[in-house]
Regions:
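Helix-rich "cap/lid" substructures immediately adjacent to catalytic or cofactor-binding pockets
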Residues: 1-34
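Non-catalytic peripheral regions of patatin-like phospholipases
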Residues: 3, 53-98, 122, 127, ...
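Catalytic nucleophile loop
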Residues: 8, 31-49
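Conserved small-residue
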Residues: 10, 20, 40, 99, ...
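Short, hydrophobic alpha-helix immediately C-terminal to the catalytic nucleophile
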Residues: 18, 22, 44-45, 171-172
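A short alpha-helix-loop-beta-strand transition element characteristic
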Residues: 68, 103-114
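Short beta-strand scaffold segments in enzyme catalytic cores
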Residues: 115-121, 151
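ATP/pyrophosphate-binding catalytic subdomain of soluble kinases
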Residues: 141-179
């Protein structure tokens, strides 16, 4: 396998990935595998089902967010105080209806690209990978079922939720398939740039949360490096995951594309047209800058 594209989770920040994909298409870089989790899973499945990037961008900008995010606040509050059975914040029905209209499952199963999405089994705590031959709407809903926000979904009778809980950047399938060029699209600059120290409690919380999202990816990269050059216990000298195609060995190179600024907590749930438009533009510009002269 030559090329793989990895799409991280990150809620509304997923619009950034559309811009990155627009640049990759323009550059003639077509992945044979696309792996995604959470919002990255939705984008991956859209790509695998044959949706044009122009359609994806249009969809991101125009869908009715008020219908999409139907809040069940009273049930949620009552469940917090144990006055009734646990209830998530959002009603998943609008998202299920949207995905049913958006995703052509027949086209997805016939895709020439390997599409892989993830979800976590609540009972076994197992991170599971599903490919395009088996994916249906339940799998996509499960991968995007952010805990507390959306309810877990049942796959083969077992409850599953957001794969990003355990691995927000699912690079392992690409590594295992021996992809020679891997482009990883992060939805945060954390792990992709040197950052200023946080100056407020909110910034501390934001950075802590971002670190939790990048952790599994950093661990995967450290493991990959250690297979080539064993490190003493407690030490990891693997190159930063951020350096475009600098994380290379003889038979494999990994590039990272990421925003060049902190996006803030609100960006996770801000599906407004202004933010979507801005993030698509930033995704394109960051990819052009960070991958210039490095993809072929």
């Amino acid at each position: 396998m030559e090329r793989a594209l990895i799409l991280s989770g990150g809620g509304a920040r997923g619009a950034f990935q559309v811009g990155v994909c627009q640049y990759l298409q323009e550059a003639g870089w077509v992945p044979e595998m696309v792996c995604g989790t959470s919002i990255g899973a939705i984008n991956a499945v859209a790509i695998g089902s044959g949706m044009k990037l122009e359609q994806m961008a249009h969809f991101w900008k125009i869908y009715d967010r008020r219908k999409m995010f139907r809040i069940t606040m009273l049930r949620f509050i009552l469940s917090l105080f144990k006055l009734r059975k646990f209830s998530p914040l959002m009603d998943p029905t609008p998202m299920r209806d949207l995905l049913s209209d958006l995703v052509d499952l027949d086209a997805l199963r016939e895709s020439r690209q390997e599409i892989i999405i993830t979800a976590v089994n609540l009972k076994t705590s197992q991170l599971r990978y599903f490919n395009h031959n088996t994916i249906d709407i339940d799998h996509v809903m499960a991968s995007a079922a952010v805990p507390m926000i959306f309810p877990w979904q049942f796959i083969e009778g077992e409850p599953h939720w957001d794969g990003g809980v355990m691995d927000n950047t699912p690079i392992i399938p690409a590594l295992e398939h021996g992809a020679k060029q891997i482009i990883v699209v992060l939805l945060s600059p954390v792990g992709a740039a040197n950052l200023s120290l946080p100056q407020s409690h909110l910034q501390v919380m934001e950075l802590m949360f971002e670190h939790s999202l990048i952790g599994a990816y950093e661990t995967s990269m450290a493991y990959r490096a250690s297979r080539n050059k064993p490190q003493p216990l407690g030490r990891s000298d693997h190159p930063p995951a951020t350096l475009p195609f600098n994380n290379c060995r003889e038979d494999q190179c990994i590039a990272t594309v990421a925003p060049d600024r902190m996006l803030g907590f609100r960006s996770f749930f801000n599906f407004s047209r202004p933010q979507v438009t801005q993030l698509i533009r930033e995704g394109y510009n960051c990819a052009r800058k960070q991958l210039k002269g490095l993809i072929q």
